[in-house]
Structure formats: C-alpha cells, structure tokens
Amino acid sequence: MSYCPNTPEDIREMLAAIGVASVDALFAPIPAGLRARSFALPDGTSEQELLRQMKQLAGTDRPVTGFIGGGYYDHYIPAVVDHLSGRAEFYTAYTPYQPECSQGTLQALFEYQTAICRLTGMEVSNASLYDGGTALAEAAMMALRVTGRNRLVIDGSVNPFSREIVRTYLTNLGVEIVEIPARDGLADRPALTAALTDLTAAVILQNPNFFGSVEDLSDIALTAHANGALLIASVYPISLGLVKSPGAMGADIVVGDGQSLGNPLSFGGPSFGFIATTKKYIRNLPGRIIGETVDKSGRRGFVLTLQAREQHIKRHKATSNICSNQSLCALRGMIFLASVGKEGLVDLARLNRDKAEYAKGLLGSIKGVKLLNTAPTFNEFTIVLPKDAAEVAERLLGKGVAAGVPLGAYYHGMDNCLVVTVTEKRTRDEIDALAKELEGAL
C-alpha cells in the first residue's frame, strides 16, 4: 500500500469522531516536558547523496579473512540461487495454502523434501523449520511424543547454542535433560551408555561435532535402540557429500541447519532448519509436509498435508506451533543442491576436506600448537594453543584474520582451544597467512 498522509480534512473528521477539538487537546494528558517538539534528524536528501553516504559507511568496515564456523559457514553461493529465488513467483512470505494457485512453490518444496531425504538417508522430510537449533529442539520433542518417555541424553560435543535452545524449549515441561561431557572432543561412549535408562526417549549427537570431529554413530544407535530410545543426529549438510549418511548409521531423526546450502551468513540469519525421519514417525513430524496427489481430472498435483499444527487441530494434539515460513530459504537450499548436483556436492565436500587437511597439517606443525585429537575431520578442527585462545584470536583479528572460535566461553578448561574452519572459499595463500600470523602471535 502506498503511503498516504492524513489531509487536514482527514484530521478534522477523526478529531470530530472522538470529540476532541484539536491535536494539542488530544495529547494534553501528556505533560509538556515529555512531549517532543523537535527531532534531531537531518533534512531529506537525494538518492544520489544517500548512496554516497551509505558507501562511505560501508567503507569503514574492516575486511577480514574468515576461518570462523561453529554452525554457520562462509560457502560460495552460485549466482543462479539469487536469480531464481528472487523471482516474483517465489519471493513471498505467503504460505501456499491454496494449491490451485501455488503449484510452482509446492512442487519446489516437494523436491526440497526429496533432496533432504536423499542427503540424510531418511524416508520423509517436512517442508523446513526455523533453523538448526530449533530443529533439534523439535526433534527432541518429537522423540518424547513417539516414546512416551521424559528423559533425554545429549552429548556435550553438540553445538552449545543448540543445546541451550533444547533446554529453553523443554526445561519447563518436566523433561529431564542429561548432558554427557565430551572427552577430548569426542563422544564419551561409556558415559553415554551408562546414562541410558528405560525412561530415556533419545540420545542426541552431532556429526561432525562442534569440535569438528567425525564419528561413526552406528554403535551408539544400536545401544540406544536396545534400550528403547531413539537416536537424533544433528548434521552439517555439506559434509554429507563425503560422510556416511546418518540414516545409514541408524539414526531415527536427522536435523541440521540449511544455511550452508545457498544462504548467506547475513549476521546470523535468516536460514532454515531441516528435519527428516522414517515413515514410521511421519505423523509426529512438526510443521508442514508437501504431498503429491492428483486433481479431479487425474493430473499430478501437490498440496500441504499432515499439517498437525495448533492452527488446524486441537492444541493438545498438535505436534508443533510453527507459524512463520522459512520456505524461501529452503527453496534457496533446493536451488543450491540442484545447481551443484550429486557429483558436484561430492567435489565440494572433498574440496572442503582437503583444504582443511592442509590447514590442519600447517597449523599443527607450529611450535607449541597441537591437535585436540586425531579423529578424522571435515572442514573444522580444534587446535590447542600454548596461550589463551581468545587473546590470540583478538590479536589476529587486528591483523585482518578471523582465526576461529575460542572454546573457553563454552567449555570449562578449554581456554586454550580454538576451532578453525576452512571452506572452499579459503585460498592456499590465505591459509598460509593464517599460519604465519598465528606463529607470530605465539
């Protein structure tokens, strides 16, 4: 709607309708000292001058080379992602409730669900969630519904922000959350096994984990199932070009953040979360599912189905109260996957792995620096420094290098640990520069 200011006649009519003589009389109850008479705002400016001012502000930003990950990653986004997702047919906050006029969006999201299932090795996916952290919380609540139990065991190597979101969702619901500290950046298998009881609904792990370590979760899945619990796996989608799928490891519910699939960092959002499971649990999936059907003429079509949200059914029977729509971000994820293709995703994952391995070897050879463990990694790894990692990272930032994520703020006793991330966008020269600056800072 265009902005249409009130005319003097509009103002007179409104004042007459409420029985007030003037605008001043309307605001008379507010003490004069509290009423603003003027505002410290500049006069209007031309478009050309405004652009000049904005460019000057942008010029004050310090360019840095980023080796920061921890959940959100600096991946290349093909131009086709912006081009297609920006088309008027897709670029909308509208939820496709009317299938007769939303077939394009519905089919695109149906293909998204298919892609997520193939990526994770699962059988069904919904049409997206808010982000990776809330997707993990939704998976936890789903496990509670499926099993009828009220206890969760979560590994300490799961992203600390995601763990906090799970606690926020569940703390006041009478759910017992047992957190098992990681051991040297890896899941403590004996402790996880010992924590399982006949009240445990699920075991929650992340792969690759927050430290960057990649583990085979198959044995943990078997142990969980033997105790009647589910395995929830949080994954990094790009890594699945190389890493064994969570479905193949025996996971019952798989979640993750889709930011790395064609969505920019953009100060932390927006993004989308994905969730996938087996057909057995399809009616417990939160959010919306796009289904394939036929119309009255026998033609193939797509519709929203199994919308077990509180807007559609009785609140106490709803699987979630998800309302806002992340479909545009999920669409970007689908376009990204379609543009790189199956073989391209493998190549992309291998490029991330290879560059990280080069960086790992280079940084690990610096005097006083060692790796947290010898487990395989994808594009993140944790190094142990002879100094406080936060102080070292701050010093390198002054040199134009965002060196990684210091762990002291998230894990007790790990003040000297730094998680370094190397995506396909980092060059050999940039990695060499990181090693040089790090060595100089020690």
Curated annotation (Swiss-Prot):
Any one GO molecular function term: glycine dehydrogenase (decarboxylating) activity
Key word Nucleus present: no
Enzyme class at the top of the EC tree: oxidoreductase
SUPFAM superfamilies named in the record: PLP-dependent transferases
Alphabetized Gene3D superfamilies for the sequence: Aspartate Aminotransferase, domain 1, Type I PLP-dependent aspartate aminotransferase-like (Major domain)
GO BP term, pick one: nucleoside metabolic process
Database matches in Pfam families: GDC-P
EC number assigned by the record: 1.4.4.2
Keywords of the record: Oxidoreductase
Record's catalysed reaction(s): N(6)-[(R)-lipoyl]-L-lysyl-[glycine-cleavage complex H protein] + glycine + H(+) = N(6)-[(R)-S(8)-aminomethyldihydrolipoyl]-L-lysyl-[glycine-cleavage complex H protein] + CO2
Entries under PANTHER family matching the protein: GLYCINE CLEAVAGE SYSTEM P-PROTEIN (PTHR42806), GLYCINE DEHYDROGENASE (DECARBOXYLATING) (PTHR42806:SF1)
Cited function: The glycine cleavage system catalyzes the degradation of glycine. The P protein binds the alpha-amino group of glycine through its pyridoxal phosphate cofactor; CO(2) is released and the remaining methylamine moiety is then transferred to the lipoamide cofactor of the H protein.
Subunit description: The glycine cleavage system is composed of four proteins: P, T, L and H. In this organism, the P 'protein' is a heterodimer of two subunits.
Family to which this protein belongs: Belongs to the GcvP family. N-terminal subunit subfamily.
Protein name: Probable glycine dehydrogenase (decarboxylating) subunit 1
Naturally occurring in which organism (per UniProt): Geotalea uraniireducens (strain Rf4)
Gene: gcvPA
